[in-house]
């Protein structure tokens, strides 16, 4: 047995004896490193005569290739073994009884709880829940809501756009849940025209929305809820009553003072922002008392252009709509300081702020439970 064969046998034995990736790396350095045994053999080729190099070169290079391949195979084997061992170690027997601990019982996320609370309150007022796609067309997200091409209000939304499809139709992640209002009005208008059923629209629309914004009080994905009423006699007084009843029920106070400030939204006219009376002197906001005011939502009468584009004659029908951020009012009601924690999947956070699975939405007296 010559020196190369003896060296190869020794290296292969060392490779086989390695029990982890650190051991494999040590063998690689000893054999193929800058001062490794195989590397030293390769260096001797430079001092050989052409005849000797022609004889020894293929043998030494072949040794290097076989060692490299053996190292790779052994490393793969060890990685597979490590994964198998980890799977065996972390295997869960699903037939075992659940251990009675806070973590094992799980918690309802505050966003899910607040959505349940909101929809339950409006359901008691006779509203139904409507939903729509997260991916919308430019038409439904902007144009049908009275955002004309080039309107500066479009620039107010830092929007996630998709590349145009084969129909050259620009799509995007919706920046608000308002497109569902248009879809619903179109559906009811078609039903009225085809079947003669002129039904009142009363819907509440919870869902995810998307904008390029991220800080302690903003997230690129956030939750929003909107409401819409369309009828021949809908008016601002109706809207104010609905919102007052909602605020009392949601914040669980017997009365609430509201003030409406003129504002601007392309899809409503007139448009107002709603503040409610509160006390912000302590660590948590208290509603229904104090001398402070806090903005809660935006609302207004549905713009005639929106009604018209959705199949309703604004000379006959009127509507009102409102919208609010679910994440924000959840933070206000339950005292959560940082919006980003909603999406961190921290078990400690969800144990503190989460709700038991059997909790029912908290409804104020006067609404059914």
From Swiss-Prot:
HAMAP family xref list: Phe_tRNA_synth_alpha1
| Keyword Nucleotide-binding found | yes
**Subcellular location, in the record's words?**
Cytoplasm
The entry's Mg(2+)-binding residues are 269
Per the UniProt entry, the disulfide pairs are none
Q: Name one GO biological process term.
A: phenylalanyl-tRNA aminoacylation
Whichever gene encodes this chain, its name is pheS
- Which EC numbers characterise this protein's activity in its record? 6.1.1.20
In alphabetical order, the GO MF annotations are: ATP binding; magnesium ion binding; phenylalanine-tRNA ligase activity; tRNA binding
Any single GO CC term annotated in Swiss-Prot or TrEMBL for this entry: cytoplasm
Record note on cofactor: Binds 2 magnesium ions per tetramer.
Task: Print the organism lineage.
Answer: Bacteria, Pseudomonadati, Pseudomonadota, Alphaproteobacteria, Hyphomicrobiales
Taken from the record, one Pfam family name reads Phe_tRNA-synt_N
Q: Which reaction does it catalyse?
A: tRNA(Phe) + L-phenylalanine + ATP = L-phenylalanyl-tRNA(Phe) + AMP + diphosphate + H(+)
Q: Which protein are we looking at? A: Phenylalanine--tRNA ligase alpha subunit
* Complex formation: Tetramer of two alpha and two beta subunits.
Which co-factors does it depend on? Mg(2+)
What are the protein's UniProt keywords?
Aminoacyl-tRNA synthetase, ATP-binding, Cytoplasm, Ligase, Magnesium, Metal-binding, Nucleotide-binding, Protein biosynthesis
* PANTHER family on file: PHENYLALANINE--TRNA LIGASE, MITOCHONDRIAL, PHENYLALANYL-TRNA SYNTHETASE
- Record has Cell inner membrane as a keyword: no
> What domain of life does the native source organism fall in?
Bacteria
Q: Which family does it belong to?
A: Belongs to the class-II aminoacyl-tRNA synthetase family. Phe-tRNA synthetase alpha subunit type 1 subfamily.
